[in-house]
């Protein structure tokens, strides 16, 4: 949450792009008390059927909704399909493998072991 809080403090827009349905994502972000931190949540219900990750549609929809150019966006992803979707959308991707995907070859434009390994300032300086 430090990265999200820092992004919001700098006036940056923050969204979730998920291949899961809104019913799942909205429920869990509300349960965790983080729903209000996001400007938008884009899910499988927001794109054409069969166009979730690794297709770029979720990220393209997020860029359109946020009114952000792909050259000014960053995606944080934990899965190979998500990294591929981000790259296909032309967005810089930071891969942060989770315990399940750590054994897979999840390689973003930048790959880090955890969000704690990178500050927003470090990212903005790249």
Language model features by range: what are they?
Residues 1-16, 22-26:
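Short, acidic loop-to-helix structural element flanking the phosphoryl-transfer center
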Residues 5, 22, 27-126:
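Asp-based, Mg2+/Mn2+-dependent phosphohydrolase catalytic module
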């Amino acid at each position: 949450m430090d990265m999200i809080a820092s992004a919001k403090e700098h006036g940056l827009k923050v969204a979730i792009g998920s291949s899961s349905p809104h019913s799942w994502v909205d429920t869990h972000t509300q349960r965790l008390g983080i729903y209000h931190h996001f400007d938008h949540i884009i899910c499988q219900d927001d794109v054409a059927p069969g166009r979730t990750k690794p297709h770029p549609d979720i990220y393209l929809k997020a860029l359109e909704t946020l009114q952000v150019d792909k050259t000014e966006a960053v995606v944080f992803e934990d899965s190979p399909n998500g990294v591929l979707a981000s790259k296909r959308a032309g967005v810089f991707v930071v891969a942060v493998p989770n315990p399940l995907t750590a054994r897979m070859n999840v390689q973003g434009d930048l790959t880090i072991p955890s969000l704690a390994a990178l500050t927003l300032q470090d990212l903005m300086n790249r």
